[in-house]
Amino acid sequence: MISAGELNKRIILQIAQLKQDSYGEPIETWTDIATVWANIITSGGREFYAAQKMNAETTAVIKMRYRAAMHTRFRIKYGNRYFEILSIADPEEHHESLLLSCKEVV
């Protein structure tokens, strides 16, 4: 069972949708699905060199209440930060909580 105090961050679940710009060209936009309480644990980061520039990557585990419709196509918005969902785990298959392994999109 998850205690209410454990989930102390408000996050927004978003899904990508293709829409058309004013010229009729397809563009990807993100649409809010739900706002939920969660706990964000930043687990580390790394710097790497790619495409002739230095990049940084931060990983996190986000814990939230169970939602049957969760998918890795979604992303998490927390304030002005965005997280790509890499995997979703249902600890012990109890359908009480989900652990989302994520990386921050910079």
Which sequence ranges carry the predicted segments?
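Short, conserved turn/kink motifs that form compact alpha/beta structural patches or helix kinks used as
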Residues: 4-7, 20, 25-106
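Polar/acidic, low-complexity leader/linker segments enriched in S/T/G and N/D
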Residues: 1-2, 9-16
